[in-house]
Each structure stands twice: as structure tokens, then as C-alpha cells.
Amino acid sequence: GGVPCLCDSDGPSVRGNTLSGIIWLAGCPSGWHNCKAHGPTIGWCCKQ
């Protein structure tokens, strides 16, 4: 498992929205894509 994060497609805020991304510290692994244009502060918010 990983730490969930808010993708741009999930909505504007974490409140009441599903967090469909996972934070990866070293960039998105193969087969995943960055799903958040700005942030998170540490790592990348990636989605399969």
C-alpha cells in the first residue's frame, strides 16, 4: 500500500472526495501516470 493522494480528476479538495492516487517519492512507476498537475510537495501523485 501507499499514501493516497488527490488526483486532479477527484475534485478540488480532499473533503468528500475519493483519493484515487498514490504518492510515489521517486516518480511514477511504469504503467502509472502523474495525475496531479501541481503537487504534492513531496513526491508525485500517481494513478494506475
Curated annotation (Swiss-Prot):
Cellular component terms (Gene Ontology): extracellular region; nematocyst
Annotated function: Binds specifically to voltage-gated sodium channels (Nav), thereby delaying their inactivation. This toxin has a great efficacy for Nav1.4/SCN4A (EC(50)=30.62 nM) and Nav1.5/SCN5A (EC(50)=62.5 nM). It is less potent on Nav1.6/SCN8A (EC(50)=about 300 nM), Nav1.1/SCN1A (EC(50)=390.55 nM), Nav1.3/SCN3A (EC(50)=459.36 nM) and Nav1.2/SCN2A (EC(50)=1998.00 nM) (when measured as the increase in the slow component).
Protein location: Secreted; Nematocyst
Entry protein name: Delta-actitoxin-Afv1b
Keyword presence, Nucleotidyltransferase: no
Principal localisation: secreted
Disulfide cross-links: C5-C45, C7-C35, C28-C46
Transmembrane regions listed in the UniProt entry: none
Stated family: Belongs to the sea anemone sodium channel inhibitory toxin family. Type I subfamily.
Domain of life: Eukaryota
Signal peptide limits: none
MF annotations from Gene Ontology: sodium channel regulator activity; toxin activity
Gene3D superfamilies per UniProt: Anthopleurin-A
Example GO biological process: regulation of signal transduction
Entry keyword Protease: no
InterPro entries per record: Anenome_toxin, Myo_ane_neurotoxin_sf
Xref: SUPFAM superfamilies: Defensin-like
Keywords in alphabetical order: Cardiotoxin, Disulfide bond, Ion channel impairing toxin, Nematocyst, Neurotoxin, Secreted, Toxin, Voltage-gated sodium channel impairing toxin
